[in-house]
């Protein structure tokens, strides 16, 4: 069964950071649906929406947390749901 996760990452910017994160996601057969990245001064921040087998979530989290100087947060989300906001 697939799970949708939103991954946030932040830490000092450096060369190869996106490649390193992407490689780990690929190694764990995660499918990147969308991502946003930004550099603020010397800091890097990234949001990624992925699909991954639900039983691989913890293994992926452990692998990401091995990257030096980056902090990760993984949140399970639901499929695209339309939400109507009233003003």
Predicted regions located by residue number:
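A conserved regulatory-domain signal marking ACT and ACT-like small-molecule sensing domains
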Residues: 1-87
């Amino acid at each position: 069964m697939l799970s949708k996760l939103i991954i946030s990452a932040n830490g000092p910017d450096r060369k190869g950071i996106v490649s390193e994160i992407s490689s780990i996601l690929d190694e764990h057969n995660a499918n990147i649906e969308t991502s946003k990245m930004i550099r603020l001064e010397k800091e890097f921040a990234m949001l990624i929406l992925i699909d991954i087998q639900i039983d691989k979530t913890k293994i992926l989290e452990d692998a990401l947390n091995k990257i030096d100087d980056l902090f990760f947060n993984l949140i399970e989300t639901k499929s695209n749901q339309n939400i109507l906001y009233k003003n």
